Amino acid sequence: MALSNTLSLSSSKSLVQSHLLHNPTPQPRFSLFPTTQHGRRHPISAVHAAEPSKTAVKQGKWSLDSWKTKKALQLPEYPDEKELESVLKTLEMNPPLVFAGEARSLEEKLGEAALGKAFLLQGGDCAESFKEFNANNIRDTFRILLQMSVVLMFGGQVPVIKVGRMAGQFAKPRSDPFEEINGVKLPSYKGDNINGDTFDEKSRIPDPHRLIRAYMQSAATLNLLRAFATGGYAAMQRVTEWNLDFVENSEQGDRYQELAHRVDEALGFMAAAGLTVDHPIMSTTDFWTSHECLLLPYEQALTREDSTSGLFYDCSAHMVWVGERTRQLDGAHVEFLRGVANPLGIKVSQKMDPKELIKLIDILNPANKPGRITVIVRMGAENMRVKLSHLVRAVRGAGQIVTWVCDPMHGNTIKAPCGLKTRAFDSIQAEVRAFFDVHEQEGSHPWCIHLEMTGQNVTECIGGSRTVTYDDLGSRYHTHCDPRLNASQSLELSFIVAERLRRRRMSSQRL
């Protein structure tokens, strides 16, 4: 049965919720340094791009459920609408997962990244799962993001904004609504908050109660992340020791040793100056969460009106993005997102028309507020060199302020000889290099990267200094959706990017 329920949110529905929403004191945020205010490969088609709008889009009055008047793609059909309604009402009564003040703080920092004064590091699982939910996995992903951020911060000499694809990245769009194996055709797996990945009829039926479980898992993940961020686990000295260990045990350690030891020397100087491990600046960090805004009933149920500003915030995450398949100008997802005040991402591939991008940005950010829009580009190295410059010029010509981000994962999915999906580290590195090259040619700021990655020692992407081959893929291939960089590959990529940032910085200083 298709989604058609109507919802209304009220800040007075729960005494606990009311207290949380109207508390003017923001909860402690999750910068290590104080951030400024200022075999043959068989290509796989990664996406079916959104079709350009055929007519001019008229923007009517926005409301929490005005998206229901638009065409909604990629949403599941639940068999029992009343059961879904009951679950959504429960979610409405639950406390928000994040707070408006935190989202505003992230927007300010993303505005700095748009001007080249900060670097955005966004990473995490392709799709979070119920089965792999445990403290160690959360800790390991958080840890590798910390390690990467220190390397990038030293290379660029700018604050690093750390945003996880965590605590809500469950739902996944699919190019085909059905999957067929051995003549049996069932609905595709769309993420653990919708249905199960086991290939049987019962598992593939969308279950609204999975939304409650996803909410609870997100809340627990956020709780642990806050503890890690503020409880001493993020201490700079500790993170640097981890990086030195990586360098010493890497086959290409000599390549990164100089940078790692320079970071260690800088910390020694700071300690001598009084910034020891006990100082809050050295032991805590900021951290935010993000996910794709796909399952609109869930996102609506967690949207709250901020009493201090009168604006609506999607309190399921600090930042949400619209995907390549759901970014139609006259579609339901764009309609929902134009009314929430969170920082927003827009995923674009080589199929994005520059004029369409300008229109989309104008719909989502009519006030042209810095930090509001992040354009996440994913198109492969060759397309990046040909197509990106047209997008950059169009956006600049329209006077729009955006934060440009490189997603080198989705445009590089291939099929290995064994049949598993994988991504080659060399291709990922090539797309990052192309992203930097184009922005340097255009005089814009390439200070951001978006990765599907994990802190685990998986074998899902081939290559890297600790080489993963096609033959290795089956040994630790644990992803529920797309292949992820493992911890070693992720950190290696951060050293490569840091080297590029340092060269760019040194070159600009000589001018």
From Swiss-Prot:
EC number(s) per entry: 2.5.1.54
Entry annotated with the keyword Kinase: no
One GO biological process term: aromatic amino acid family biosynthetic process
Subcellular localization: Plastid, Chloroplast
Residue span of the annotated presequence: 1-49
Alphabetized UniProt keyword annotations: Amino-acid biosynthesis, Aromatic amino acid biosynthesis, Chloroplast, Plastid, Transferase, Transit peptide
Record's protein name: Phospho-2-dehydro-3-deoxyheptonate aldolase 1, chloroplastic
